[in-house]
Structures are given as C-alpha cells and as structure tokens.
Amino acid sequence: MEKKKNNNNGGDFGEEESSIDGDILESILSYLPLLDLDSACQVSKSWNRAVFYSLRRLKTMPWLFVYNQRNSPPYTMATMAMAYDPKSEAWIELNTASSPVEHVSVARSSHSTLLYALSPARFSFSTDAFHLTWQHVAPPRVWRIDPIVAVVGRSLIIAGGVCDFEEDRFAVELFDIESGDGAWERCESMPDFLYESASSTWLSVAVSSEKMYVTEKRSGVTCSFNPVTRSWTKLLDLCPGECSLYSRSIGFSVNRLIMAGIIGDEYNPTGIELWEVIDSDESHLKFESIGSMPETYLEKLRGINSDWPLTSIVLNAVGDMVYVHGAAENGGEIVAAEIEGGKLCKWRTLPNADATWKKSHAAERVIVACSNVGFSDLKLAFRNNLSFLSTSKY
C-alpha cells in the first residue's frame, strides 16, 4: 500500500488522517500535558480537531512559578523563570527575550496568583497566568512600605503597611480596575485589633470571588473585607480546638478557604495540618480536616538536618492543588499535594526542586506564584514569544 506524503509546508496540515478512532484519540489526548497537546495540534487536521474536543475532558492543574529579581536597583526581573507542571511532574524553563517589566522596587506575590510592585511613581500588578502582562496605575494616596494587596473581581485592594508619618496606620484604599478613572478610593480602615500586625509580614491573605480574607499568622485573628460595601467583618479566630498552632497560612482552592497550620514550635515543628474553613455563619467557623503533611515531607520542607527555625510557611492554593514551602529561603523543598474528594492525596516534593530552589544568585530574590494554566494561556504565551524548555523529572 502506498504511503501518503505529508506536505506540511508553511504551517499547513497534511492530508493523512489518524487511524485512531476519534473518541479514543480524544481520551488519550486529555491525559497529555499542555505542551504535548500543542505539538499534537501540528500532526494533522484530525488531530487538531481531537485536541480541541479533548479540552472538554482536560483537568486543568495549576502550575507553580519561581521568578528571580535583583535585590538592588535596577530591580530587574530575570528573563528566565521556572514553572512546575504537575501533570508532567517536571520543571519547565521559561525564557523571554527581555525582562517583562523594569521595576523601581521589589516585586512581591499575594494570594498565589497576584504579582505586584509598589513605588512612589506607580503601582504595577499582574494577574495573567504567566505574568507576562503588567498593568501600571497611579500610586496609592497613602505611602506604604509593607502592605497587604489583593485583587477581588474588578477591585484592587491595598491595606496596612503604612509609614509612621501617615495619620492612619490602618488605611485601606481601593482601585476599580475597570472604571478607567485612575483614582484610589479610601475605605473603612483595618480593624484596630490588628494594631501590632497590620502588614504583610505578619498577615496571610486569601481571596474568594467576593471577599478578601486576612488572618494574623501567629494568633489566628481573622477578618474579611467586602469590596462592594467597602467594609470589614470580624470572624472567629482560626484556631481548631484539637490543635495548638504557632503559625498558619491561608489560601483559596476553588470555593474553599484552606488553612495550613504548624504544630510544635519554631525549632521543633512536629506537624503541618490542613483544614477547610467553612464560614457560612460568621459567628461560627467549622474546621474540616483535609489532611496532614507526612513527616518525611515536613523534614524536606524544613531542610534535612537544617538548624533554621521554621517560623512560618507559605501556602499556594489554586484549583485542586496546594503547594507549601517555608517562608524563609533556607534551602527547604517545596511540598505539593492534590485535593480529591475534599481530601489531600498524592503528596510529593517537587523533582529537582533542590537545584531550582537554591540556584538563585545571592544578589537575587525569589518570588513564588501559582496559576491555573489552560491551553489558551499557553497559546497566548507563544504569541508573546515565551519559550519553553522541559527539564528531566529526576
């Protein structure tokens, strides 16, 4: 039987059709990592159609991103970043032709998906999956050093972290991203029970589609901010009765408020527990245990034979994945787990995390973020000339 030629010139697809049944091919493709799906699109017209239909079955899994930025002026973001794709269980090297943005201050991450940088001249932030697009707006009216920042719907919120010479240490400002008027609006100030901790150093932040949640890492004192009413609501403390926590971190996974808490003390942490926090009634919080970090992974998170205290942890929760690592860059590994049926499973430390996590130069700082990455996000990244280089799993 004569074999058909595949004349794939100038990006046109060949005429040879796949011999695999359409439904079977779609099912197979739905298990592939996104980068492999992009390659599959180029095989033939039938494969391109199969990829399109397989996206209906595709379970989107959030990627973890590790960025580097200079510690001193100019605060340039490195043109290379690393991303962990949980579906392929591999790190992917990301390269851009030039730095995404030139900052005049350090960039930070908040509630997993937001990157931002604050300077006297402007406020810059990015929420797209690969953080290739940055928006620049006027700086807040109140000067701040270490505020908490969040994006809830169309509202950009900045609170606390106020300089000593300002009158209101708890000042809150809101910027309507879609209004186009370019003005910050003053809102109800942060609750006074956060007097000793009204900055991002001491607070953990999570966002739902409607509210920003803020908890004091040490005490568990918690409140929420509603951008529609511009007001705060005091919630019960995030202190599960059965556990004594010395630090906690919060995040939002789908529609669930997730809390990770450390048991023991800084020099002898004995466990990390995770709960879903249900706040349907603001006068009563319910804590549903979703899992305990295995002891071996706790040791790797802290750093094998490490003498560093584990003062606090960072929780990145997006979709059905959680990523946990120490707040200090002390060489510990990143621990990941999936949420299935409301419980944590498939615990792992990220392969090659040791090399990726520690390779930052002394003159650079590490910024960690997390995003749901879909096929459309990948295509947009290609159009923005972002290149991908898959690395080995081991």
From Swiss-Prot:
InterPro entries linked: F-box-like_dom_sf (IPR036047), F-box/kelch-repeat_ARATH (IPR050354), F-box_dom (IPR001810), Kelch-typ_b-propeller (IPR015915)
Kelch repeats (start-end): 65-111, 155-204, 206-252, 321-369
Protein name as it appears in the record: F-box/kelch-repeat protein At1g23390
UniProt keyword annotations, A-Z: Kelch repeat, Repeat
Gene Ontology biological process terms from the UniProt entry: proteasome-mediated ubiquitin-dependent protein catabolic process
Gene source species: Arabidopsis thaliana (Mouse-ear cress)
One term under GO cellular component: cytosol
Domain F-box: 15-62
Pfam families linked to this entry: F-box-like
Keyword Repeat: yes
